[in-house]
From Swiss-Prot:
Entry function: Catalyzes the ATP-dependent amidation of deamido-NAD to form NAD. Uses ammonia as a nitrogen source.
Binding site for ATP: G46, I47, S48, G49, G50, Q51, D52, S53, T160, K189, T211
Species of origin: Salmonella typhi
Gene, per the UniProt record: nadE
Name of the protein this chain belongs to: NH(3)-dependent NAD(+) synthetase
Record has Ligase as a keyword: yes
Binding positions (deamido-NAD(+)): R140, K173, D180, H260, K261
Length: 275
């Protein structure tokens, strides 16, 4: 088995999907989890206005709506959380995503004050954060807020990670990577677009340039610029296609060096890092 085949198998990726079937699979997955633990009453998700959170949010609301109708439990709710750092550049996209999702409840938590307070506390301890590390601080503060909300609403935090992010480790450890349940796991980027198109999502929300937008020195830095490969390259790789050797090597390099993010926490029984 080649490394490419191993990666595809590990991430559960498929070369072709039926969007309607995958929508139903994700919705049923979320419903089944909540039904297994009836003390859980909410799904909580941060909405950024990008493709991934828009899709995960829509699937979450669909799951909650169906489960509420099936059980008669009106305590069930989907909570969409806006988590800007100050003023968000693509705020209109966030509002458009909210309008598309139609969440039961929308909360806004501005994380800037908390991030600056944490940065100042570290500075007083003699640690000056780089812009990159401050970006990770933002991602972790967003997740901290979501878990606080979930804790107060008997909820679970929904993740947006999918195969095209998992393969590159393009998420913050214990930030956007630190979630309870990931309904998009297995899908690549273009497949996520197919699901949103099938759901009737406004095109600009899934055709926009993907960006984590965490760094102050490089605002709205495209994911593809940070990774050195395009999402089309990554999707082709995950679909088993043959790529230029340099591109494949870059993708595989990301996979190997970010393995620690996909195995949390590392224990004495792990040896992947020795290879």
């Amino acid at each position: 088995m080649t490394l490419q085949q191993e990666i595809i198998q590990a991430l559960g990726a498929k070369p072709h999907i039926n969007p309607e079937e995958e929508i139903r699979r994700s919705v049923d997955f979320l419903k089944a989890y909540l039904k297994t633990y009836p003390f859980l009453k909410s799904l909580v998700l941060g909405i950024s206005g990008g493709q991934d959170s828009t899709l995960a949010g829509k699937l979450s609301q669909m799951a909650i709506t169906e489960l509420r109708e099936e059980t008669g439990d009106n305590a069930l709710q989907f909570i969409a959380v806006r988590l800007p750092y100050g003023v968000q550049a693509d705020e209109q996209d966030c509002q458009d995503a909210i309008a598309f999702i139609q969440p039961d409840r929308v909360l806004t938590v501005n994380i800037k004050g908390a991030v600056l307070a944490s940065e100042q506390a570290l500075r007083e301890a003699g640690i000056e954060l780089s812009d990159f590390v401050r970006g990770n601080e933002k991602a972790r503060e967003r997740m901290k807020a979501q878990y606080s909300i979930a804790g107060m609403t008997h909820g679970v935090v929904v993740g947006t990670d999918h195969a095209a992010e998992a393969i590159t480790g393009f998420f913050t450890k214990y930030g956007d990577g630190g979630t309870d349940i990931n309904p998009l796991h297995r899908l690549n980027k273009r497949q996520g677009k197919q699901l949103l198109a099938a759901l009737g999502c406004p095109e600009h929300l899934y055709k926009k340039v993907p960006t984590a937008d965490l760094e102050d020195d490089r605002p709205s830095l495209p994911d593809e610029a940070a990774l050195g490969v395009t999402y089309d390259n990554i999707d082709d790789y995950l679909e088993g296609k043959t790529l230029d050797s340099a591109i494949a090597k870059t993708i595989e390099g990301w996979y190997v060096k970010t393995e620690h993010k996909r195995r949390l926490p590392i224990t004495v029984f792990d040896d992947f890092w020795k290879k």
